[in-house]
A protein has these predicted regions:
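OB-fold and OB-like single-stranded nucleic-acid-recognition modules
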Residues: 1-122
Length: 122
């Protein structure tokens, strides 16, 4: 069986945070079932970074994304360098997977691109 990468759905943070997380067994992709019925496993969000955190050990980092509909954290474990060039106030085009741990929905980054002009076509 060939495993295909799911397309990242361009969405709002509120679509993710207001949905219901569905965990599937095995290698099937977990997803958030949005209120409109859309399955969100990989998402693409245009947002502003409002907070950045790096643990003392340097093995965990997180940013908080805000797109004016809601906020959500993106977390990196061990591969924290992905957040190095980013600062609070930066506008980013974020692609990542939706995950849930202990009731908190969060994103795991795959691609983060700083945006100079949010009016440019993405």
């Amino acid at each position: 069986m060939e495993i295909k990468r799911l397309t990242a759905a361009k969405t709002k943070i509120s679509d993710v945070t207001s949905g219901k997380y569905v965990a599937l067994p095995g290698f099937e992709s977990n997803y958030v079932l949005a209120k409109d019925g859309q399955r969100l496993s990989r998402v693409r969000i245009l947002a502003t970074i409002v907070d950045k955190f790096l643990s003392e050990s340097g093995r965990f980092a997180a940013i908080t994304l805000d797109d004016s509909t809601d906020t959500i954290r993106a977390k990196a474990f061990n591969a924290v360098a992905v957040f190095d060039p980013l600062s609070a106030g930066d506008i980013v085009d974020f692609v990542g997977k939706v995950r849930e741990y202990q009731g908190e929905l969060f994103l795991v980054p795959e691609i983060i691109r700083k945006i100079d002009d949010p009016n440019d076509e993405l």
